[in-house]
Amino acid sequence: MIVVKIGGRVVKNSLDKIILDILNINDKVILVHGGGDIVTDYTKRLGIEPVFVTSPEGIRSRYTTKEELEVYIMAMSLINKSITSKLCSLGKNAIGITGVDGGLLLAERKKRIVVIDERGKKRIIEGGYTGKVKEVRSEIINHLVKLFDIIVVSPIALDVEERTPLNIDGDQAAFAISKALRANVLILLSDVEGVLVEGKVINRLTPSEAKELSKKIGPGMNRKLLMAAESVENGVNKVIIGSGVKDRPIINALELNGTVIANG
């Protein structure tokens, strides 16, 4: 079983390449998609100014109000059904779901978050409607893969305590699903060719090397490396970080082009 995460820019600019590539894969595929740029577009169209916050680690993320949560769900559902309909129209047996469906992804809402304000000072603010995955009901996917070849998953989770959907990070969703399924491979596709150090792609890292390197590279990729190391330590065979904008992006990753995090 292969888990593939495609970032928002890949969804917006290279989706057809991803879909054509999936047609040539004979394994079961769990496709987790992002879509931040598209969410921002729809937010602005509806007259809502998107708000982004920066963590003390330098990671910039969307601040999700109740109003923007509704737009997020709408946009992600549109992306999900667009991907699923294209796959089905090309003869693939696919289904599109969110992490809310069946309680696939159970999360906890972030009650408070620490941000860096416009003066460069740390400040604690109300957490909005973003969450952290706490549980994956892997039996749902295990049942679905008996019926479908491809499962397209939107990164929306269910907050059981407050009974509301939550915006969750797409990478986090993909890592959580991969660990729960003990997937053979997790592929992370974005607009970079892999982990870059001094402009060159690092081809292979062990989990311990990935953790060490995470201390020396920029925000965003450092988090990917930490989660990749944890995934391999928890039963995922390998994690591959590669380009989603080149031709044959998934096949290229399976041929180990990019950065591979694995034991040994």
Curated annotation (Swiss-Prot):
It holds the Pfam family AA_kinase. The gene is lysZ. SUPFAM superfamilies: Carbamate kinase-like. Keywords: Amino-acid biosynthesis, Arginine biosynthesis, ATP-binding, Cytoplasm, Kinase, Lysine biosynthesis, Nucleotide-binding, Transferase. Substrate binds at G35, G36, R62, N167. Belongs to the acetylglutamate kinase family. LysZ subfamily. PANTHER family: N-ACETYLGLUTAMATE SYNTHASE, N-ACETYLGLUTAMATE SYNTHASE, MITOCHONDRIAL. This is [LysW]-aminoadipate/[LysW]-glutamate kinase. Pathway: Amino-acid biosynthesis; L-lysine biosynthesis via AAA pathway; L-lysine from L-alpha-aminoadipate (Thermus route): step 2/5; Amino-acid biosynthesis; L-arginine biosynthesis. The record marks K5, K224 as: Transition state stabilizer. InterPro entries: AceGlu_kinase-like_sf, AcgluKinase_fam, Asp/Glu/Uridylate_kinase, LysZ. Coiled coil: none annotated. It is found in: Cytoplasm. Its EC number is 2.7.2.17, 2.7.2.19. It catalyses: [amino-group carrier protein]-C-terminal-N-(1,4-dicarboxybutan-1-yl)-L-glutamine + ATP = [amino-group carrier protein]-C-terminal-N-(1-carboxy-5-phosphooxy-5-oxopentan-1-yl)-L-glutamine + ADP; [amino-group carrier protein]-C-terminal-gamma-(L-glutamyl)-L-glutamate + ATP = [amino-group carrier protein]-C-terminal-gamma-(5-phospho-L-glutamyl)-L-glutamate + ADP. Involved in both the arginine and lysine biosynthetic pathways. Phosphorylates the LysW-bound precursors glutamate (for arginine biosynthesis), respectively alpha-aminoadipate (for lysine biosynthesis). GO terms for biological process: arginine biosynthetic process via ornithine; L-arginine biosynthetic process; lysine biosynthetic process via aminoadipic acid. Disulfide bonds: none annotated. One of its GO terms (cellular component) is cytoplasm. The keyword Transport does not apply. One of its GO terms (molecular function) is acetylglutamate kinase activity.
